[in-house]
């Protein structure tokens, strides 16, 4: 039985502009064939088992000819695979998607087109330029700048284009001087506002503005390279009023997120929403404890405990996973009082239908100790399911009040093997900030570096403009112990507060 090919538009660069339908077929494909302009983050939406084939074309460097790409799609579909052909922008707007669809149709193979947000409208929009506006024009033309404007058989109708309110030219940086000259020659006013937008909708976005007459010179002066979109028309002047993306507080900042990949999304998405370029280098990942028996035993005798204290969201999830394995659910905690370090831990408990009697306002053991002390706990049996390696101040203090405390490892943290390579790449490309959300993220990152690397990171944090952001005082102290200067530490030890503090730092 033959498979099916989905021609999916990846959008202009911002991964959030992928359509819901595009994300859905990506999540269930057997093979992914993708272009240079498709955001690499989108590849993570495909199953780990899916084959990934890069067929990108960058300038004159073609990984694979169009004919071979067509045949590859036919071969994969002929083998019964569900294939996603991920193309930058929209597959049917200067994307050669029509040729690929024709090749599939010629062999009787099933295909479906899932349109994408074309860069022809998205890049101008992110630069604050509407391609149509009743105050300026109600017509727009999309053209390719990849064609040689001087070839005898050119299909470019310059006389007609010169009369259209907005002309949007894709892939035209190389030929920009000729394109502008041709429009002026055809009667377009040389003083017409114009703009070039490179890497539109991404944190690398770069915008150059001018007139039809001087834009080529301005583009050359700043060294603007492809991929870029050119907009010609009165609408380009609206950028002065409507520019928004490049004004975001973290626009263009390269920020490393060191949380575990499974937990990074909230921090990464919050920073991305403020314009940052996120580099995820997970310095920790979470695994079950090497010996699961202590947790299993504790779960089997919950009726013996008066209190269960959770010190992290991971501890909650690991505990409930063990509870489920034992064939139990939250009802087993009916006789226990619950305590949580920080609102994030309490929120995960609430997701399981439970409300903590005691919640520390800050995400640190000392905050929970203060809250529990006010409760007057003494003569109680207390269970603390937590990380295999953790500070002892909490169980020791509670035990000193006359309680019987049992600590069981619910999970352990390890350093992902691929992170050393990711860290080296990130540091070589340059960073504006590194975020740390736990002491273990600091320790693991620094242990990936040799002494020279640690010294250089410390130097950059003090002299080179690298901002170290720590979620709380314990994490900050760990960073300082490695010689790092911590410039950002929120008063409230939460992800949201960390994002706000980092934004405020760069805005100041």
Please describe what each predicted stretch is.
Residues 30-32, 52, 130, 167, ...:
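Short, well-ordered beta-strand core segments
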Residues 12-13, 59, 65-69, 77-79, ...:
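Signature of uroporphyrinogen-III synthase
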Residues 1-15, 20-117, 122, 221, ...:
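Class I S-adenosyl-L-methionine
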Residues 3, 88-164, 208, 358-364, ...:
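Class I SAM-dependent methyltransferase SAM-binding "motif I" and its flanking Rossmann-like core
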Residues 102-106, 118, 122-125, 131, ...:
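Acidic, glycine-enriched active-site microenvironments
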């Amino acid at each position: 039985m033959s498979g099916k090919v989905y021609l999916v538009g990846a959008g202009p660069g911002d991964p959030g502009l992928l359509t819901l339908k595009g994300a859905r077929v990506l999540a269930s494909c057997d093979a992914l064939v993708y272009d240079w302009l498709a955001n690499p983050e989108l590849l993570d939406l495909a199953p780990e088992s899916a084959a990934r084939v890069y067929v990108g074309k960058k300038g004159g460097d073609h990984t694979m000819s169009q004919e071979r790409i067509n045949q590859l799609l036919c071969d994969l579909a002929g083998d019964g695979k569900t294939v996603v052909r991920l193309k930058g922008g929209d597959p049917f707007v200067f994307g050669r998607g029509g040729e690929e669809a024709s090749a599939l149709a010629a062999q009787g193979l099933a295909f479906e087109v899932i349109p994408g947000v074309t860069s022809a409208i998205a890049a101008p929009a992110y630069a604050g330029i509407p391609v149509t506006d009743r105050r300026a024009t109600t017509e727009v033309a999309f053209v390719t700048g990849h064609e040689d404007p001087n070839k005898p058989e050119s299909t470019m109708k310059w006389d007609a284009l010169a009369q259209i309110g907005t002309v949007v030219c894709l892939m035209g940086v190389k030929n920009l001087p000729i394109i502008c000259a041709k429009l002026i020659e055809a009667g377009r006013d040389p003083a017409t506002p114009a703009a070039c937008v490179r890497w539109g909708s991404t944190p690398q976005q770069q915008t150059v503005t001018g007139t039809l007459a001087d834009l080529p010179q301005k583009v050359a002066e700043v060294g603007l390279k492809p991929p870029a979109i050119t907009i010609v028309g009165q609408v380009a002047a609206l950028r002065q009023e409507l520019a928004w993306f490049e004004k975001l507080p973290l626009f263009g900042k390269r920020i490393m997120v060191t949380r575990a990949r499974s937990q990074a999304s909230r921090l990464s998405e919050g920073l991305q929403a403020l314009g940052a370029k996120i580099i995820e280098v997970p310095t920790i990942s979470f695994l079950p404890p090497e010996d699961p028996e202590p947790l299993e035993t504790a779960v089997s005798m919950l009726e013996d405990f008066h209190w269960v204290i959770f010190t992290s969201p991971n501890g909650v999830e690991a505990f409930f996973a063990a509870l489920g394995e034992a064939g139990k659910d939250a009802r087993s905690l009916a006789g226990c009082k619950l305590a949580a370090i920080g609102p994030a831990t309490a929120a995960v408990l609430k997701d399981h239908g439970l409300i903590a009697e005691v919640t520390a306002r800050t995400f640190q053991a000392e905050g929970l100790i203060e809250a529990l002390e006010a409760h007057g706990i003494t003569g109680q049996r207390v269970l603390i399911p937590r990380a295999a390696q953790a500070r002892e101040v909490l169980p020791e203090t509670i035990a000193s009040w006359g309680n019987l405390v049992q600590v069981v490892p619910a999970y352990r943290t390890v350093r992902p093997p691929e992170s050393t390579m990711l860290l080296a790449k990130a540091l070589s490309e340059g960073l504006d900030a590194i975020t740390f959300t736990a002491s273990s993220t600091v320790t693991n990152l620094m242990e990936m570096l040799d002494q020279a690397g640690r010294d250089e990171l410390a130097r950059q944090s003090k002299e080179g403009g690298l901002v170290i952001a720590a979620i709380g005082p314990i994490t900050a102290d760990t960073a300082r112990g490695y010689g790092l200067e911590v410039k950002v530490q929120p008063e409230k030890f939460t992800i949201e507060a960390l994002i706000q503090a980092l934004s405020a730092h760069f805005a100041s």
